[in-house]
Amino acid sequence: MNGFILSVSEWILFLSTFIVVLQPLCAMFGPTIPIAIFLTRFNAKTKIFNILYLIYYYLLFTFIYRVIIDEELFLLYKLGLTFIAVNILKYNILLNLGIWNIFLETITDNPPMNIDKKYFEGHKLFEDVDNFKKIRSEVLDIVDNYDIKSLKELSTIFRNAVEEKNDGKHTWRFQFLKQNGKLCEILDNYPTLKNALEDKLIFNTGISILDPKISIPQHIGYFKGFLRYQICIETNDDDPNKPYIICGEQKYTWKTGEGVLFDDMFNHYVVNNSESRRIVLYLDINRLNLPNIIIKINNLICDIYSKDKLSNYILQKQHVQRKNK
């Protein structure tokens, strides 16, 4: 198998193998070799990197095609190389969702912040005054009784995702309650939360805790097929330095008991200059502001991702709930 295009394809295939294998390993165990450190510094969800993914997929398909038609290769060898290439293609889609992100970005048109909540009717259950009191009580019980780790401790992917103080106490912490459409065991003791999170539109949920004087640098999300809903569980509403988020150059200031729907695929960052912690309930919602056929495809992609053994194994390794002693 000779030729410039094929040689490039082979190199892309080899490099993508490193990406597929090392990306989850980095997430679980931390970078142990230079290439792992190199790879985790990339945000594979930016528009520029998505364009590179399109080029990569073109080269990968070229490789598969050339392998199949090459008369010099044994059939078994052809099948083996094709199987490897197709699986690399599969896991890159499942882990990075790059091509689908590009497509959704071309057909969606919504503001960064304060998206109409009609696209998530479930917000009413969270924002109902009486129900919110119960939800808030259960969330704070989890915060007080579980050892909720910094995102930096959960995964090396987040090691640059928060500005920490050096006292070991002030950071950005996160506790999953629902992952890949599946409720976590922790909810067995919290019936109000469990009932609210059984909504099939909710794909991921967690408790996000931003300690006093902590900020989250600029970043974007990973999947355009979601909208992000947050309801504020705790903040000091009387503090003039209340925490806020800037998303797509639009500012939103959290208020206890108030929910907001936004698109985290816009560049955004969070600032907490107050002396109080900010706690929000964080939900990834399957996007509904799409044509019906696209909604069905998007839901199918989410369903495939939720059943993927590799991604579920990684999440289990990253987010283990430990109760305080």
Where are these regions (language model features)?
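Intrinsically disordered, low-complexity, charge-biased terminal/linker regions in eukaryotic proteins
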Residues: 1-97
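Non-heme Fe(II)/2-oxoglutarate
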Residues: 3, 7-10, 14, 73-78, ...
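A short glycine-rich, His/Asp/Glu-containing loop-to-beta-strand
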Residues: 194-212, 225
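Short, conserved beta-strand element in jelly-roll/cupin
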Residues: 209-211, 222-239
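Short beta-strand His + acidic residue motifs that chelate non-heme Fe in jelly-roll/DSBH
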Residues: 216-219, 245, 262, 268-274
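A short hydrophobic beta-strand segment most commonly corresponding to one strand
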Residues: 228-235, 261, 275-292
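A short beta-strand-loop-beta hairpin characteristic of the jelly-roll/cupin
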Residues: 233-256
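Conserved metal-binding segment of the jelly-roll/cupin
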Residues: 253-267
